[in-house]
Amino acid sequence: GAQAVGIAWTDGDQIGVFDQEAVNQRCYSKVGAEREALASFTAAGEAFAEPTYAYYPYDAANDNKEITSLTGNLPAVQNMDSGILHGDYKYGRAKGSGASGHEFAFTHMFSLARVTVDASGTPLAGDKLREVSVSVTRNDAPVAVAGQFEFNARNGVWKQTDAGSGTVSLQWTDGPQLNSSLTAYMSMFPTVKSGDTFTITVSTQNYRACFSAQSLADFQRENIYGLPLQLKNYSSLVVYDKEGNLEYPTEGVKTGTFTCATLNVDGLPSGINSDGPGKQGTVTLGNKANLQGWDFLAVSEDFEYHTQLATAMSNYNAGTYRGSLGVLNLSQRADTDGLGFFWKKGLSATGETMVQYTAEIGGLTDGANTLIKKGFRHYVVTVADGVDVDVYITHMNTWSDKDPSSFEPVQIAQLCQLRDYVLAQLKQNKRPAIVMGDTNMRYTRHKVQDNFITPIAQAGYEAIDPWVKFHRNGEFPTWGGKSLMIRSNFKGDTKNDICCSDDQRGEVVDKVWYINHPLSSVQLQAVGCRNDVENFVKSTEAAEYKGVTIEDANGNILTNQTVSFERKIGLADHFPVVVDFKYTIIKK
């Protein structure tokens, strides 16, 4: 249902006011600290003789803009700690004047959703609320309900100026307990139509509940729409604990496990890379991989020694091999992506699709990126009866510390191309997805969160990095900091690197992310993650460095330290990144 929105002005509110000609603008501030429906405002400086138009909230960034092209942001994440409503944009028009000044009538530009959470009869009852997120889709495509916009303060007409977010989240740092029904309000663009799908997630300190519902109305501005979330009444309700284990429902549920890995096999011809494993080293590498029991493996730089690798991996089937590079003719682009995919015999991998990246940079002496057709591949892997997973494997552009301003935009463009493809398939197929490979990226030097993690969240999903979950306490490394090196990869660079306490806490460029579709009957949960150093050691050597910055096992950063350790040298120049998964099949 819907009802008209009321207005309650609070202490600290400010409005932008235009004069009769709608040319000059000034900031007016609320008088008094009371919360009230009718409030008085006073100008900062000389007041207008005929104030005529107004908008809320005032933003100094709009001071020099025309009344028809003001800008605003309805935030996708709305923090509820202070109880203040976010994104509550209004426009006002003078009604007349009297002894107390000019009277304005304000109209809300957007819609409000009254979210009432009742967790009684579910595991969430009595737990502390952390977040309520509402994602909106129409025919499986996200509906933008938050984002940047431009508006006209004369009449409240607005238009979106970015891609927007299909999800709005209310968040609490130390939220209330769900002992009884709780009501909160979220601002949304009035873009929701009758029949649109709401995918709702309620997260507490120890649980996460997911379910879906249909919109019964076309949202209009200046209206409140009720979202009565009595959780136990939703037949689509699924509840997980904080570790991702299924709590509800329990009937008709099947579970199982599988393991995947990603590895750069360093397979350039020895004429180009004399330090690579070569034929015999690749045989050893393949034999080691063959014995690990992984269910499927993504490899990159699978060029010259594919035959040796595939023969050694006798327990596996392989995807298309696209060839090597011609050592004697490096002026021509080789028709290969260097990618390889292996899956255990008895499983199936279908729908092989190859996509070349449109952005690229770097010739023979700058990463050799343009000598091949770098890109990504897409497979549908059936790991068990009824368990299909979309798997994406990739090898991205190299990074250059000599010219990062040229190389980083290309890498980000490739990441965004991959992200958009994955999101499109996710919406269409409603299957869980795994994205893995040599990204040549680090969270510390590339804006991976801004361009991959966050946009996927804004689309209503969650991209999870098991390494962040298991080895970084769920916190992404800070962008712009020094590289967090695993022990075996630390070479004493005190200017750019931090030596981590072991071979697990450090970051490598080989990534594995996974994304669940909330409406899928198959859900994935990472239950383990490791850089498999121990099984892929060629040799060891003693290492000692002085005056270095280290990170200890508790995450403390210590400067000017002396470290000594046994460095493990791999069979290739990368170690495998391995992730163990648990899958759950929910009969809905």
Show the residue positions of the predicted features.
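Active-site beta-strand/loop signature of hydrolases that rely on acidic residues for catalysis
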Residues: 259-265, 285-309, 342, 379, ...
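N-terminal, active-site-proximal structural segment of metallo-dependent hydrolase catalytic domains
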Residues: 235-314, 331-336, 573, 580-588
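Residues within well-ordered beta-strands of beta-sheet-rich folds
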Residues: 18, 53-55, 112-116, 259-261, ...
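Acidic/histidine-rich helix-loop elements
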Residues: 262-283, 361-370, 397-410
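Sec-type signal peptide cleavage vicinity
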Residues: 1-254
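Structured beta-strand-rich core segments of catalytic domains in phosphoester-bond hydrolases
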Residues: 299-399
